[in-house]
């Protein structure tokens, strides 16, 4: 209910009045055994908005917690209020005591109740329920229930509980120990080594319990202090766990070795959310998810000292984004390969890092609406040009020079006149030509592969290599002093000749430019000889100009290859990898610019994590305890402020021709001595107190490097070179001039001003993104694995403001949404739709429905602020509800689609049936007409074919009869001739004795014997001749009888053949007529689809036709069955016809064989005659009669079946005919 207004409540909003009444009511109803409220971490009272906002009258806030036994109990607002009042009292007493941050007995202390308990409550389940730590439950309970007076003396409490503390020993290291006693400002501490030391109480810091050793996020530490943070990072580092969290900031410690925490398997695990441990992959994944969810550009800002691992971290982030947003175009692979190119041309070995980035880069990766990479854009800042010509001992120039000399092919070396790296002055001056464990030749081959992948043509590659070789040969150009004034001339050797050849200019012109300078005196042009120093600067200036422009041109080519296409949506993730903070023994203009860039990045870091955060809390009226931090704005003012900032004074001095580095140093001391970040030194030196520490600078070379002069004669020489790239560079240089280029002029904009403009442009771009910070830490200065230098790490942590980040993250609200945004995104999750529809009421109702603890959020005037992890709970629930909605919609849409499909299917089938029926009827008419025409033609053709066949058979029979007659005639002639020969032989034998001469009587007996034998042989021959004649007569008689019978048989066969042919023709004509008549008559009332039959002459068995949709009939006899019966009958007719033809052929062949036997009888092997042709003929006739009788019976049956089918067709109508 709503309380009436009173003087005490007039200033309160309606929401506060309602909350107060609910708290009072809960206090009355609170059970006696209610456990004490948990100490709030961070300190928050969930302040509600002022009277401008109001909540529903029925609004109630309650939370849940777990007691010591693990059961869930309710924590009412009254309990929270009582706890808050106790906390306020504790804070007031601690403020009166004056305690240093997390130490004992100091003057100041920024309290957070989290640091007062050695065993603080662990994180809640799902970020909503707070659970008490399961370790030392008894001590935990005692801490919550002990009197407030015990907290007033932390040292006594630690002595009583024998808790561990951190103390700094004489060597500056932190060690664990236990307080033995205390007096005044000193304490006796027993170290873990059993030694007792006396230390200042202010130097004691509480140590965390063992359960918190090596936690992933520093926020989880019960006591937040420098030794605890150092120890936690050290434990993880020695376990090769190099990534930790400090609230929203990822801390990456360089392991200086390969660790097995990368690769496709790990990438897949983070993509699928299987792993959530701190990792650069996790940061990249969070940036990608936020980009897709919020549709806002993201940025990964990687910072740290030189050698801390920024470049490698950036490569791993790009690797993850390439895997996450990889598409079909393959641009992500090109993006990864750009790193290889940029490292070769922009990285070098320094005293602190073997692969130090000597330029800053921002790579902006663009994504399509589907989250796929569609292109990228690369920006670079302040390449260290001086490294091309000047090196400190133990350092190297850019990697590309050494890789080119080591890995170029013999043909390329011959073309570029290349030698080994040791023969070039620019490379050999530092006595460092190689890097341990690095193969420059192999690196060069990988570079060539990267060039091909990024699609830089071979021609452009060779041009770039030619200019690199020209730079190396320029370094070998030497000078000869010609007079006492130290004027010089160029030595004409192979160095200047090769340099001129590679640049595409005349050797003499190059020598003139290197040794003289043209001055304009009125209308006259005077050539002034240069001194050795001036000539050397001119030579080095040309080399630096060529290399710097070549680097910029290479970046342009990469941007062309990675250009974003039409799929650009404005969504992007930028990765910033810039040189780290540097402080060497000798620090010049380059270190000043690098440290200035890091100061600007630190300000961006402070702005987003401290300034904007706390300003927004205060403006929106939420309860907030301000966190102090070190602001570097004063240092930035020292550098940037006009007109007496360091850069402004540098530009002013650079414009004075007679100004020197000493006059510049004096001017700095004169104008900047009041700034606390500046300290003048003797001579040309001065100190700047940067955020990362104090750096001593030497102004030697500041003015010259800031001017970066380039004489007009040099630009004119480059523009006249045959090399296309040099012409391009000179054209760009002319275009950058703000006024017409005169002979003695150089470009006007100074390097410092240009770099400042680039930084401001970079900051503006980063301001329009959601930043994700990665702080890289260098564990030791020797670049050795498993070496942890606490002082070096602590210095970097202080510079990064890690402890302040953790404090503000503990008590901060990283997620903030306007009431409208929160209600619009999560309002549909409400189960109660009766809630007022204003955004604030909806937002509070959602929080109430999911029992979000008041400590986990605050309600501002315009926004809702949530602790870390709370938004993930609402996103998970929203995702589940949306998935359920989508599933329901899917099933409903599926039901509608299936119903629509079934309806369309029914309509389609009806339409198809009508169309198919019409097509079938048209086809039947066409085939019937064609069949009638083909039948008439077929009958004519068949008649002519029969006549032709008969004529052929008759001719064959006539020829056969003629041949048999000829053979008989030949046999008679042979018999006659044999008779005549026998008669002549007999007459000759009778005449022999008459012709013989007289013989002696002694041989008479022999002659008589021979005569008797001859007579006997003659009589025997006569008898055989008589028998043969008789046999011939009998054969002639039998032949005449056979001839008569054969003629009679042929006549009978021909009659029967004609009769069967006539009967078959009549049956076919009758069948065709009946089929045509029945189908034509039933066209409108039958459902049988028309079928066409083969013509009678071919006797085909095919039955083609068109089917129509089937239908159900009451008598169970479907059209399909009747069609099959009709087809069966027609098949039977075809079968009978084929059988008739086959049988006819068989009988013809048998009869022909009988005739052949009759004409030429042969003897069997045993000498007996074969069976007589008459017997064979009788058997053949019997077989023919039997087959004819059976064939006629089957013809009658088939005819009857045809009549029956025709009757069935007449009794049934087509189903669509009935519908009509």
From Swiss-Prot:
<dbReference type="GO" id="GO:0030048">
    <property type="term" value="P:actin filament-based movement"/>
</dbReference>
<dbReference type="InterPro" id="IPR000048">
    <property type="entry name" value="IQ_motif_EF-hand-BS"/>
</dbReference>
<comment type="subunit">
    <text>Homodimer.</text>
</comment>
<feature type="domain" description="Myosin N-terminal SH3-like">
    <location>
        <begin position="160"/>
        <end position="209"/>
    </location>
</feature>
<dbReference type="GO" id="GO:0003774">
    <property type="term" value="F:cytoskeletal motor activity"/>
</dbReference>
<feature type="compositionally biased region" description="Basic and acidic residues">
    <location>
        <begin position="82"/>
        <end position="95"/>
    </location>
</feature>
<feature type="region of interest" description="Disordered">
    <location>
        <begin position="68"/>
        <end position="95"/>
    </location>
</feature>
<dbReference type="Pfam" id="PF00063">
    <property type="entry name" value="Myosin_head"/>
</dbReference>
<feature type="domain" description="Myosin motor">
    <location>
        <begin position="213"/>
        <end position="879"/>
    </location>
</feature>
<feature type="region of interest" description="Disordered">
    <location>
        <begin position="968"/>
        <end position="1007"/>
    </location>
</feature>
<feature type="compositionally biased region" description="Polar residues">
    <location>
        <begin position="1"/>
        <end position="12"/>
    </location>
</feature>
<dbReference type="InterPro" id="IPR027417">
    <property type="entry name" value="P-loop_NTPase"/>
</dbReference>
<comment type="similarity">
    <text>Belongs to the TRAFAC class myosin-kinesin ATPase superfamily. Myosin family. Plant myosin class VIII subfamily.</text>
</comment>
<feature type="domain" description="IQ 3">
    <location>
        <begin position="942"/>
        <end position="971"/>
    </location>
</feature>
<feature type="domain" description="IQ 2">
    <location>
        <begin position="904"/>
        <end position="933"/>
    </location>
</feature>
<feature type="region of interest" description="Disordered">
    <location>
        <begin position="1075"/>
        <end position="1118"/>
    </location>
</feature>
<dbReference type="GO" id="GO:0005524">
    <property type="term" value="F:ATP binding"/>
</dbReference>
<keyword id="KW-0112">Calmodulin-binding</keyword>
<keyword id="KW-0518">Myosin</keyword>
<feature type="region of interest" description="Actin-binding">
    <location>
        <begin position="638"/>
        <end position="672"/>
    </location>
</feature>
<keyword id="KW-0505">Motor protein</keyword>
<comment type="function">
    <text>Myosin heavy chain that is required for the cell cycle-regulated transport of various organelles and proteins for their segregation. Functions by binding with its tail domain to receptor proteins on organelles and exerting force with its N-terminal motor domain against actin filaments, thereby transporting its cargo along polarized actin cables. Involved in endocytosis via its action in endosomal trafficking.</text>
</comment>
<feature type="coiled-coil region">
    <location>
        <begin position="1003"/>
        <end position="1071"/>
    </location>
</feature>
<dbReference type="Pfam" id="PF25369">
    <property type="entry name" value="SH3_VIII-1_N"/>
</dbReference>
<feature type="binding site">
    <location>
        <begin position="304"/>
        <end position="311"/>
    </location>
    <ligand>
        <name>ATP</name>
    </ligand>
</feature>
<feature type="binding site">
    <location>
        <begin position="353"/>
        <end position="361"/>
    </location>
    <ligand>
        <name>ATP</name>
    </ligand>
</feature>
<dbReference type="InterPro" id="IPR036022">
    <property type="entry name" value="MYSc_Myo8"/>
</dbReference>
<dbReference type="InterPro" id="IPR004009">
    <property type="entry name" value="Myosin_N"/>
</dbReference>
<feature type="compositionally biased region" description="Basic and acidic residues">
    <location>
        <begin position="20"/>
        <end position="33"/>
    </location>
</feature>
<keyword id="KW-0677">Repeat</keyword>
<keyword id="KW-0175">Coiled coil</keyword>
<feature type="domain" description="IQ 1">
    <location>
        <begin position="881"/>
        <end position="910"/>
    </location>
</feature>
<dbReference type="GO" id="GO:0005768">
    <property type="term" value="C:endosome"/>
</dbReference>
<dbReference type="GO" id="GO:0006897">
    <property type="term" value="P:endocytosis"/>
</dbReference>
<keyword id="KW-0009">Actin-binding</keyword>
<keyword id="KW-0547">Nucleotide-binding</keyword>
<protein>
    <recommendedName>
        <fullName>Myosin-2</fullName>
    </recommendedName>
</protein>
<dbReference type="Pfam" id="PF00612">
    <property type="entry name" value="IQ"/>
</dbReference>
<feature type="compositionally biased region" description="Polar residues">
    <location>
        <begin position="997"/>
        <end position="1006"/>
    </location>
</feature>
<dbReference type="GO" id="GO:0003779">
    <property type="term" value="F:actin binding"/>
</dbReference>
<keyword id="KW-0965">Cell junction</keyword>
<feature type="region of interest" description="Disordered">
    <location>
        <begin position="1"/>
        <end position="54"/>
    </location>
</feature>
